[in-house]
């Protein structure tokens, strides 16, 4: 008999939630061990998608995160069918969480996208919160970290969502003019208008292993060119090989790499070598 989470629990009388299964390879392990490994499968290395709150928890120094602009809410200004209901049903205000934090003592402004809110899509609130985060960084002379996880621009907001591409990119240009760094972390997936704007504009572009990164998805490209793409196409390792990503970093090592980068950007007295 094939072992599943259900029959393991039935046989041993184990309460629900004790076991979990990798979505990629079906490997079964204890939920506690899975969480301690930062939701990465120890067998195949698959990086399970994380909520913005969970990612902040293991990325920044404990107790250092101070959220900003959490009260901003999306509005269905186009009266798009079903959009208002989706907003009301969600427990989140929108697809990004922003705030000030410290990473190994270095002060930063951080924005983390959450794929659980409408596929991490970028609408007016996402664009506004990211721009406000950058403006806060400019005011306080802090470097910026954005962790992306998004399917692209939010269709329910039409051209207003597309406008956020230029809006966020312009804000990052101001950051660069003031000699402040932007570190971009690309997670699975980072696609569409987010990939075509701020996500790929980092002074350092870091990606998690096997993350899907690109504008159009592989299925759309295959249907357009009528050719089958390789499995590695648009994955982070492929982009690193072709110069679009600076470094692919395992989730457990993200803090160490960010510390090295921040040491370089704040002190300017060392060579940056990963």
Swiss-Prot record:
Cofactor binding description: Binds 1 zinc ion per subunit.
GO molecular function: acetyl-CoA carboxylase activity; ATP binding; carboxyl- or carbamoyltransferase activity; zinc ion binding
Catalysed reactions, semicolon-separated: N(6)-carboxybiotinyl-L-lysyl-[protein] + acetyl-CoA = N(6)-biotinyl-L-lysyl-[protein] + malonyl-CoA
Chain ranges of zinc fingers (C4-type): 22-44
Major subcellular site: cytoplasm
Binding site for Zn(2+): 22, 25, 41, 44
Pathway assigned in UniProt: Lipid metabolism; malonyl-CoA biosynthesis; malonyl-CoA from acetyl-CoA: step 1/1
One GO BP annotation of this record: malonyl-CoA biosynthetic process
Family: Belongs to the AccD/PCCB family.
Xref: Pfam families: Carboxyl_trans, Zn_ribbon_ACC
Subunit structure, as described in the record: Acetyl-CoA carboxylase is a heterohexamer composed of biotin carboxyl carrier protein (AccB), biotin carboxylase (AccC) and two subunits each of ACCase subunit alpha (AccA) and ACCase subunit beta (AccD).
Keywords: ATP-binding, Cytoplasm, Fatty acid biosynthesis, Fatty acid metabolism, Lipid biosynthesis, Lipid metabolism, Metal-binding, Nucleotide-binding, Transferase, Zinc, Zinc-finger
PROSITE patterns (alphabetical): COA_CT_NTER
Compartments (UniProt record): Cytoplasm
Domain CoA carboxyltransferase N-terminal: 18-274
Protein EC: 2.1.3.15
Listed GO CC annotations: acetyl-CoA carboxylase complex
Function: Component of the acetyl coenzyme A carboxylase (ACC) complex. Biotin carboxylase (BC) catalyzes the carboxylation of biotin on its carrier protein (BCCP) and then the CO(2) group is transferred by the transcarboxylase to acetyl-CoA to form malonyl-CoA.
CC cofactor: Zn(2+)
Enzyme class (EC, first level): transferase
Protein's name in the database: Acetyl-coenzyme A carboxylase carboxyl transferase subunit beta
Gene3D superfamilies reported for this sequence: 2-enoyl-CoA Hydratase, Chain A, domain 1
Species of the source: Endomicrobium trichonymphae
Entry superkingdom: Bacteria
């Amino acid at each position: 008999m094939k072992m599943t989470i259900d029959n393991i629990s039935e046989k041993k009388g184990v309460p629900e939630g004790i076991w979990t299964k990798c979505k990629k390879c079906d490997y079964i392990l204890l939920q506690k061990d899975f969480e301690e490994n930062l939701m990465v499968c120890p067998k195949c290395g698959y990086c399970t998608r994380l909520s913005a709150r969970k990612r902040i928890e293991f990325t920044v120094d404990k107790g250092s995160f101070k959220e900003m602009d959490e009260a901003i809410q999306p509005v269905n200004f186009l009266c798009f069918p079903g959009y208002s209901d989706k907003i009301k049903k969600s427990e989140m205000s929108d697809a990004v969480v922003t705030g000030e934090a410290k990473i190994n003592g270095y002060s930063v402004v951080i924005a983390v996208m959450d794929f659980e809110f409408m596929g991490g899509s970028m609408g007016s609130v996402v664009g506004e919160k990211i721009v406000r985060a950058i403006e806060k960084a400019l005011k306080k002379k802090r470097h910026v970290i954005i962790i992306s996880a998004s399917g692209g621009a939010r269709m329910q907001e039409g051209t207003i969502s597309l406008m956020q591409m230029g809006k966020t990119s312009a804000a990052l240009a101001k950051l660069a003019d003031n000699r402040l760094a932007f570190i971009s972390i690309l997670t699975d997936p980072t696609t569409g208008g987010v990939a075509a704007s701020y996500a790929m504009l980092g002074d350092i572009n870091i990606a998690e292993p096997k993350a899907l990164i690109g504008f159009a998805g592989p299925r759309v490209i295959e249907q357009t060119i009528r050719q089958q793409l390789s499995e590695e196409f648009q994955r982070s390792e492929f982009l690193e090989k072709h110069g679009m990503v600076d470094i692919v970093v395992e989730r457990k090592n993200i803090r160490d790499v960010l510390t090295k980068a921040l040491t370089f950007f704040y002190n300017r007295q060392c060579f940056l070598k990963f």
